[in-house]
Each structure stands twice: as C-alpha cells, then as structure tokens.
Regions:
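Hydrophobic core segments of alpha-helical transmembrane domains in multi-pass membrane transport
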Residues: 42-54, 83, 158-163, 208-218, ...
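Single transmembrane alpha-helix segments in multi-pass membrane proteins
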Residues: 49-114, 138-144, 291-306, 338
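Alpha-helical transmembrane segments within multi-pass membrane transporters and channels
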Residues: 115-156, 310-311
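Loop-to-transmembrane alpha-helix initiation sites
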Residues: 147-149, 203-208, 250, 282-284, ...
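Cytosolic-side transmembrane-helix boundaries in multi-pass membrane proteins
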Residues: 1-51, 55, 234, 241-248, ...
C-alpha cells in the first residue's frame, strides 16, 4: 500500500513533465524559420541576377551604375509594396498604373488652371487619389464582384478621363509646364530631388521606397491590421466569423495602393515638369509581377513587403543590366517572363518546404 501511494506522485510528475519535453522538441530552428520566409526565393533570384550581370556587364558594379539600378527599382518598388499588401489581402488592382498618371495630371492641371501654389494641387491630388482607392474598395465589398472586374472598370474610366480632361482643358495630350509656379521647387525637392552621398547621386525616390518597405513590414508583422490582412487573404469567411472588419481592411488596402500611386505620380510630374496623359498603361502588371516574384501568392494570404522590394530590385537590375551589357532592350520582356515563371516555381517550392517543416 505504501509503495503504491509513493508511486502515485512520481507518475503524475512524469506525466506533467512530458509536455515540457515535447515543447522543446517542437521548437523551430533558425533554418526552418528562414525557409518559411516568403521572400527567400526572391532573395536567391536577386543574388543570381546580380552575379550574372556583374560577370557579363562592364560597369555594372560601379557606384553610379548601382545608383541607376536602385532608382529604376524604386520607381517600381514604391507601388509594389502597397500592391503586395493588397495581394496578401486576396485582391488585385488593375487601375494602379493609370492612377499614377491621374494623380500627376490632377496636381498639374489644378495648380496651373487655378494659378494656385503647387502644394495646393499636390494636396488636392492626394484627396482625389485616396477617394478613388476608397471607391475601388467600397465597390468591391458592396457588390461582391471580383476585384478584376471592379478595377478593370476603374482602369478604363481613368484612361478615358486622363485623355479626355487633358485635351479638354489643355488642348493637347500633355499638361502645361508648371516649373515657374510658386511651390514647385520645394515640391520637387520632396518628390524628385537628388541626394549626393560620397560623390554618387541618389534619387530621393529610393528613400520613399525604403520608407514604404519599412512601413509595410511594420504593419504586416507588428500590428493588428497586419493580422487582419493575412486573415482576410487566407480565408475571408473565417476572418469575418472571428470579428475581423473585412470591408474596412479591404478599403484601407485599396487606399494604400492609391497613396503609393500619389507618391509615384508626384515624382513623375516634378521630374519632367509636365505629364503625358497616356502614360501608365501596363504598369499595373509590372507592380503585380514584382509582388509575385517577391513571394506573394495570387490566391492571397501569403507574402511580405520585403519580398516585394526584392522583386522590384530584380526588375531594376534586369532592366539596367541589359543596357550595361549592351544587349537589345527588346529582350527585357523575355527575361521578365522567365523570371516570373522561375520565381513562381521557386516560391512554390519554398512554401511547400516551409509547410513540411512546421
């Protein structure tokens, strides 16, 4: 009897200790965490592209050349970050490319026609851009139509308005120059200036790009909104069932894309003083491809802001690397398609490996 009673506590202690041992066994190693990162495939691809052009293109490794690569990457990356967040949330925006042009046209024509300070036009452009983004999100959540249809309609409307209003107001397909208007110099300093570091000139868009990457990563990884984005993209019905504000999340994501389009549009305007109303068509696909190369799933619920930045960097290295290698630039789209296929396959393999190790 005594032996039986004394064995009882030991048995309980052994049972209690068992889960502790299991938890130690199930701890994720740093390698497994690395394999689970969405941007792993794009980082491998970026390193391969960098080494490739470093070997075959004379001058690719020069500081001035790398500055050019970063600038080309930033013009795509500014839009790729919010587009990636939208794709993680399970949606697309086919109007993103022409919205960049729309925001530039609004700033230019409002300032010129109203003889207002350039910053007034910039502010009006921001409000209108955000309203267009909110419209996309509102129509999506209220009609339940696919985002492809909603944003394709917005794309066509913006294309028509860009051309129609520009011809109606300015009489041509381009805006009047606003270089001599009040506030232009300070606005150019914010959106299109050049910063010299160690004798090498870098465009300010690189800083905008890095800031958006940092902001996007913080939202996804450190905030409740980031959890909502992943939840909505993974399973919208399940997210709604646990109290996630699905409609507000999607409207906010579309407004985020509109904000990125506004920044890109102001850079376009203040870089050239005037805007061609037909620009931007087709760029929406480039932003989506950069996000996919960076690890975003077409179906949503998976991806990262850093991955989209790496995808944009691959674009920049390829577009400028072909020039430095003195190849025919017509080959760029071939490389673009090949990178998309390879990156998609590599990202799918990385995701399967990540799922297998968890």
């Amino acid at each position: 009897m005594t032996a039986g009673r004394s064995a009882g506590p030991n048995t309980v202690e052994q049972k209690a200790e068992a889960p502790v041992a299991d938890e130690r066994i199930l701890r994720t190693s740093p390698l497994k965490k690395l394999l689970a990162r969405p941007e792993l495939g794009s980082v491998v691809g970026a390193l391969a592209v960098f080494v490739f052009f470093a070997l075959i293109a004379d001058g690719f490794l020069r500081a001035a050349s790398l500055s050019t690569v970063l600038y080309a990457s930033s013009t795509i990356g500014i839009m790729a970050v919010p587009v990636a967040l939208l794709m993680i949330g399970g949606e697309f925006d086919l109007s993103a490319g022409v919205l960049v042009t729309s925001s530039a046209l609004i700033s230019s024509m409002f300032s010129y026609q109203m003889t207002a300070n350039t910053w007034v036009g910039v502010g009006v452009s921001l409000l209108v851009s955000l309203a267009i983004g909110a419209f996309n999100g509102f129509m999506l959540t209220r009609t339940k139509l696919p985002s492809f249809i909603i944003t394709l309609g917005t794309f066509l409307m913006l294309c028509g308005m860009n051309l129609g209003f520009t011809k109606l107001i300015d009489g041509t397909v381009s805006t009047k120059t606003i270089a001599d208007m009040q506030g232009f110099s300070s606005a150019r300093a914010v959106f299109a200036s050049t910063v010299s570091v160690g004798g090498v000139d870098f465009k300010v868009t690189i800083l905008w790009w890095l800031a958006l990457v940092a902001l996007g990563s913080w939202i996804l990884l450190r905030t409740r909104v980031g959890n909502w984005i992943f939840a909505v993209g993974g399973n919208e019905d399940a997210a709604r069932a646990v109290g996630v504000p699905v409609a507000k999340t999607k409207i906010g994501l579309y407004m985020g894309v509109a904000f990125g389009a506004w920044i890109s549009g102001q850079h376009l305007l203040f870089s050239f003083d005037a805007v061609q109303s037909g620009e931007g068509v087709g760029n929406e696909l480039i932003y989506i491809i950069a996000a996919v190369i960076g690890g975003c799933l077409i179906t949503g619920g998976y991806g990262s802001a850093i991955g989209s930045a790496v995808g944009a960097l691959i674009f920049g290295m390829t577009s400028k690397g072909i020039v430095f290698a003195e190849w025919n630039p017509d080959w760029f789209k071939f490389f673009l398609g090949a990178m998309l296929l390879l990156a998609t396959l590599l990202n799918a393999w990385v995701r399967k490996r990540a799922e297998a190790t968890t």
